[in-house]
Amino acid sequence: MDWRLIIGEGNVYWNMALDEAILLLREEDKIENTLRLYVFNPSGVTFGYFQKIFESINIDFLKKNNIGFTRRITGGGAVYHDANGEITYSIIADIKFFPIDIVESFRKICSGLIETIKMFGLNAEFKPINDIIVNGRKVSGSAQTRKRKTLLQHGTLMYNTNLDILARSLIVSKEKLIAHGVKTIYERVTTISRELGYKVSKENVIETMVKGFEKALKINLYRDNLSKEEEELAKKLLSKYMSKEWIYRR
């Protein structure tokens, strides 16, 4: 089965607008199933649709350091997207391709990341509902939304994320850390480079992610460009993701 592969980068607002644009156009059968691999440049923070902003992210720190932030249309928690240490993936595809059960659909899509991590010589495991763990620490998290015919799942793969900035950008309650059996965020999360003991490159990670998703999902990815309609719709949605009404709605 052939899927489109879109590789690119953009700021936090553009990336979220583009994911929604692709979702809406896939729902109308105007585009094919798509895997998008992208970088947040400059670095940014996204947080879940249902989250309360003042309980999720450190707004003062983000503003002082010119780190953009916005709310996602998907659930899940707050994420720091490092321009030099994290690749985000999004899968927008026919909902029939995935199990109806939410956990099993997460498991199927995350298998692409698990294959990727294995190709670096590390053991990874899926931890429901949406985490991937390496040596007991989180290296990836994902979030999902569904329309009638289409599923969107996007998530992270931290390969060299600055964990100090991550820790300062997000608000993680002591209760949540305790629930995971750790005291600090440094014990809770990790990166591929940290686990390997040497730095891996962005290009290597992207190339390996392509192979990992092809193997796990049994698909053939072909490189493609955004259509004019995708770009135009994303531009229209951009104002939504930049608006205070959307960002501060909860």
Predicted feature descriptions by range:
Residues 8-10, 49-50, 83, 142, ...:
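Fold-independent oxyanion-binding glycine-rich loops
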Residues 1-60, 64, 72, 176, ...:
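Active-site loop/lid in soluble adenylation, ligation, and acyl-transfer enzymes
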Residues 59, 79, 86-215, 236-250:
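Catalytic beta-strand/loop module used to bind and position nucleotide/cofactor moieties
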Residues 66-87:
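Glycine/serine-rich anion-binding loops at beta->alpha junctions
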